[in-house]
Amino acid sequence: MAEAATGFLEQLKSCIVWSWTYLWTVWFFIVLFLVYVLRVPLKINDNLSTVSMFLNTLTPKFYVALTGTSSLISGLILIFEWWYFRKYGTSFIEQVSVSHLRPLLGGVDNNSSNNSNSSNGDSDSNRQSVSECKVWRNPLNLFRGAEYNRYTWVTGREPLTYYDMNLSAQDHQTFFTCDSDHLRPADAIMQKAWRERNPQARISAAHEALEINEIRSRVEVPLIASSTIWEIKLLPKCATAYILLAEEEATTIAEAEKLFKQALKAGDGCYRRSQQLQHHGSQYEAQHRRDTNVLVYIKRRLAMCARRLGRTREAVKMMRDLMKEFPLLSMFNIHENLLEALLELQAYADVQAVLAKYDDISLPKSATICYTAALLKARAVSDKFSPEAASRRGLSTAEMNAVEAIHRAVEFNPHVPKYLLEMKSLILPPEHILKRGDSEAIAYAFFHLAHWKRVEGALNLLHCTWEGTFRMIPYPLEKGHLFYPYPICTETADRELLPSFHEVSVYPKKELPFFILFTAGLCSFTAMLALLTHQFPELMGVFAKAMSDIFCSAEFRDWNCKSIFMRVEDELEIPPAPQSQHFQN
């Protein structure tokens, strides 16, 4: 019974929605017919006469107050709409209308229709759009204590948003903790430390975890099973505590590297022990997975420290060894760190070899991969490229390949060229990025701008060709050329990831919503009426009375514009304009 009643209500609702959607003209004429039939009982003519009499008794001060109040209200609405649009990228009135009024006036539930009628291709595109809107860990993220905090000390600005730091805290809990942490006092403390919001509380917890190893972790083990000779043995120190101190307490890269080397000793020992016990149960397997993540993170950050300190060849060797030792851990995107270090060494053949492995159709793309491939192809022709010569003789095969590579990169992330061409100011990259978004463009340009400048003519070629991409994809939100359509979620996610003092790059450029233009026009129109009424009260009063008579009188069909102005002239006693002698003759 309940299902039948629900089905009947849904069918009734759909019929009403259909009637409002397609038969609104019939409803409109029915309402007009009812008003005409009930004009005598409702005393419509008498009410119109009363309204007309009331309007005729109003003074010009009333119209000044009315138009002034309307202008003020519409101005306030305009200011609020503009602020909301600048902050969230959409109109507040439009959003409320779509969210609350559209379902009542015949909106269709897109989720249900997509779930019931979607094909395999649609589901694939939906999965792709979800993956493109996913927030990723920035493989080139800076050190909080040695770089982000120093920026705050100098400028007084916070380079990281709360949303970004919260995502980092979730990553740390995922990679550096496991279910058996409560069995080890130091790991139990660090499990709470990763959830702390206060940086000083996290640092204090890390120091406490290290002190526990010195005080409470001494165990006695016999040297020989049947012997009375005993040995005092220290349990391994907490590697994750050293990681936290290196990331947040160290004020220089050298201090961070020293702490990461201590973390490497502790983490390597834990990894070797858990590797031997990983097959003894699910608990040991989870602990081994955690120790693997810790070890990979430490080695990667040590390589980044070497890169920051100028030991680029050493950093490249460490990254290569790490990728060989753990080839399946692609979540850290170590190959992007390797590409940047190889570009610094100008080892372009090695860069091409890395791209040949990772620039694959089955792997997720990134701005680093696309723009590095474009840089290598531009390097072959950029030193001799001239727009004038190319327009006369046409593009050669190599130049065409370079231009196509640039178009491919710009289609993937259209925000990067403005930073590479220094048309937009750079800020410190966030700890997380959104692929194809402004955050990824900042992270790429922050580290790779120097590599583009080093290649002679590369930026000139980019400047001459990058805008041609948009002619191939006139509707990027609906259909792409080489990639999926550009996701519409990038602006919202980038506003959460990037600090408030940065102006987020938006693609494609949004036009001003209708309601902002409408309220601006309404505010201007009512302000003009208020000014005219204040300056010419008698003329505007007569004009308002004439208009009210036209719309309220039963004989409004016999009036025209000429009668309005004749009445205005009669009541103001305006003499007729003198006619010229030529006109009289």
UniProtKB/Swiss-Prot annotation:
It comes from the Eukaryota. The chain crosses the membrane at residues 15-35, 62-82, 512-532. Its main location: membrane. The modification Phosphoserine is found at residue 386. It is a multi-pass membrane protein. It comes from Papio anubis (Olive baboon). PANTHER family: SUPPRESSION OF TUMORIGENICITY 7, SUPPRESSOR OF TUMORIGENICITY 7 PROTEIN. Signal peptide: none annotated. This is Suppressor of tumorigenicity 7 protein. Keywords: Glycoprotein, Membrane, Phosphoprotein, Transmembrane, Transmembrane helix. One of its GO terms (cellular component) is membrane. Glycans are attached at residue 47. Belongs to the ST7 family. InterPro entries: ST7. It is found in: Membrane. CDD domains: ST7. It holds the Pfam family ST7.
